[in-house]
Amino acid sequence: MSDSPRLTRRPEWTELEDHRAGPLLHPALRELFAADPERAERYVVRAGDLRLDYSKHLITDETLALLQELATATDVFGLRDAMFRGEKINVTENRAVLHTALRAPRDAVIEVDGENVVPAVHAVLDRMADFADRVRSGEWTGHTGSRIRTVVNIGIGGSDLGPAMAYEALRAFTDRSLTVRFVSNVDGADLHEAVRDLDPAETLFVIASKTFTTIETITNATSARSWLLAGLDGDEKAVAKHFVALSTNAGKVSDFGIDTANMFEFWDWVGGRYSFDSAIGLSLMIAIGPERFRELLDGFRIVDEHFRTAPAEANAPLLLGLLGVWYGSFFGAQSHAVLPYSHYLSKFTAYLQQLDMESNGKSVDRDGHPVEWQTGPVVWGTPGTNGQHAYYQLLHQGTKVIPADLIGFINPVDGLSDELAAQHDLLMANLFAQGQALAFGKTGDEVRAEGVPEEQVPHRTFRGNHPTTTILAAELTPSVLGQLIALYEHKVFVQGAIWNIDSFDQWGVELGKVLAKRVEPALTEGADVPGLDPSTAALVAAYRTHRKK
């Protein structure tokens, strides 16, 4: 149990409250830029290939100094170092938190309970690479001798969101002769649509479940097995050539019919939402190849080292985490928008939703006390420019404080025609324009100068002062994707450390799963389920009455 003062009673916290109520009671970005001609150059930080411009935030040098004092007081750096050392900072499950070990170099030494875990990590990576090369080259064939043309990844949560996001992000680097599809929802329509046009003889299923008991995943895997056997004359031997497992439960894997030689393990010190650079990334490795996958890992490691070694004033994940605390706790912001100006990052924000909201969606601190401060925000967003024609109206003229990240790349991906590549300038013009419009808005006088009728002026005025971070990189590559993900991983860590919550458990996921197991017999068999509230009992009854048999 900690004997340190509660967060909101720390002097560093109250100083920030006073700062917000005093000099930053009514912050104006136009005034902040006018007062500091070098602001645009000074408020930039670099991490690897990423350039972060945070000049359009409602902060001053004093704000940054006070936030850094809060980080020091809450021992963000001590907890960071403990994580990298392999200490068990996941206090509710008594586990180490070592997703960083998944991208450590071969010669690194990272111990858990006295054992260096790095050799095991690289042993699995080497096995993954061998298997991926065999599938990609056609050496690995299906039961009938046909080459594998489609990989179907079946998982849920971290076993789906990460690989699916990265596959879309790196589609330009994939082997176009082989495609990957992802199935996660226990809704049978998900699997149906994924396999309806596939040839079982050319399909490989990757089943991702650490325990091999995850109900949604095993339900889908069992249905996929039935689909496969129906298409291959019911020969049970076919399963071993068309299914591989990402799991640690050899018994369950073997019972399913999968050869345990094709089971790829991972460890309990890797949380699901941090796991796609482990064996969970096998489908991605098959798609982009082992060399590109290792470039992805290198990108992760670049920002890991940046977070571990960069000074506070130049530490990008620390800065993003502090800004999130600033807006959530001192401006009342309830959400955070992540707006990538890249079609390839169409699933990036959905991935960050789990990373951030499952990590920091907590209401008790590490000592089990209810928190008295805001914790994790709602994370949302879609790629630009689509969002501009949907919800940017609220960002520009709504009443809520919504910090946003604008993510863009200076160069388009290779492989586009000259005409399509030229559209990239228009895409990025929109990114830069939105950052300016959100920050500086448009005054009434500026509107009047355009000859707008006076009665229209209030409707066409934009107050600005909407904070954004602009993140730029030269182009979207496997390494840059790894850097982006690690940037957000460590940002989430910083916020959890300041809020004194356990960012690495997810007990909130469990309750609904337990109740679903109890409710299902009432739907399928009409069994009585004790403990149902009247509303849920009535819903179950209505379902049974109208369910088609």
From Swiss-Prot:
**One cellular component (GO) term of this entry:** cytosol
**Principal location listed in the UniProt entry:** cytoplasm
Q: Which reaction does it catalyse?
A: alpha-D-glucose 6-phosphate = beta-D-fructose 6-phosphate
Q: Which residues form the active site?
A: 358, 389, 513
Against InterPro entries, the record matches this protein to:
G6P_Isomerase, G6P_Isomerase_C, Phosphoglucose_isomerase_CS, SIS_dom_sf, SIS_PGI_1, SIS_PGI_2
One Gene Ontology molecular-function label: glucose-6-phosphate isomerase activity
Q: Which Gene Ontology biological process is one annotated for this entry? A: gluconeogenesis
Q: Which SUPFAM superfamilies match?
A: SIS domain
> Is Methyltransferase included in the keywords of this UniProt record?
no
The record's subcellular location field reads: Cytoplasm
Pathway given for this chain reads: Carbohydrate biosynthesis; gluconeogenesis; Carbohydrate degradation; glycolysis; D-glyceraldehyde 3-phosphate and glycerone phosphate from D-glucose: step 2/4
| Annotated EC | 5.3.1.9
Is Kinase included in the keywords of this UniProt record? no
Q: Could you tell me the keywords of this UniProt record?
A: Cytoplasm, Gluconeogenesis, Glycolysis, Isomerase
Q: Which HAMAP family match?
A: G6P_isomerase
Role this protein plays: Catalyzes the reversible isomerization of glucose-6-phosphate to fructose-6-phosphate.
- Family per record: Belongs to the GPI family.
* This protein's name: Glucose-6-phosphate isomerase 1
By which gene is this protein encoded? pgi1
